[in-house]
């Protein structure tokens, strides 16, 4: 049975999201995306029904890319999808496992609590939990090597996996 991310890849809204992501470039001045791009992304994420659901799922998978290009906009418009009080949270986290990047320590600090909470949720698929456990291990190794400073310490990691 395909998951929502797979559905999004083949749906018009998911394809539209992918096109917008490909057009999203880093600005020369380090600022946010243009107003025109913001309007397009916002129209897509605010769409109702399955069209909007699949668009949000598709964008959730690329949240590290979005955050890198437009941190303020992503924080204001996308990160709330990952909060467990959102009806989109399970689908957002499930699609997030397909991301090619864990994301920056800054991004992880903004989704730290729901990230740690997902390990105790009964509505998450086992293979999703395994993927995120791998991410947790990678963050701990990166912290230990001094490469970076993810906002999750060993005690929090251990407690979330119990």
Residues covered by each model-derived region:
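Non-catalytic all-alpha helical scaffold/repeat segments
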Residues: 1-162
């Amino acid at each position: 049975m395909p998951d929502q991310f797979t559905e999004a890849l083949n749906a018009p809204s998911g394809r539209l999201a992918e096109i917008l992501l490909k057009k999203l470039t880093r600005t020369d001045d380090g600022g946010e995306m243009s107003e025109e791009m913001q309007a397009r992304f916002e129209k897509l994420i605010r769409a109702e029904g399955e069209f909007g659901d699949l668009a949000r799922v598709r964008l959730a998978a690329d949240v590290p890319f979005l955050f890198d290009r437009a941190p303020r906009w992503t924080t204001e418009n996308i990160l709330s999808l990952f909060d467990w009080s959102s009806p989109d949270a399970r689908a957002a986290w499930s699609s997030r496992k397909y991301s090619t990047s864990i994301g920056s320590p800054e991004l992880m600090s903004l989704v730290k609590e729901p990230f740690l909470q997902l390990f105790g949720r009964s509505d998450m698929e086992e293979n999703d939990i395994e993927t995120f456990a791998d991410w947790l291990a990678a963050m701990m190794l990166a912290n230990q090597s001094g490469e970076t400073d993810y906002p999750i310490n060993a005690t929090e990691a251990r407690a979330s996996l119990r």
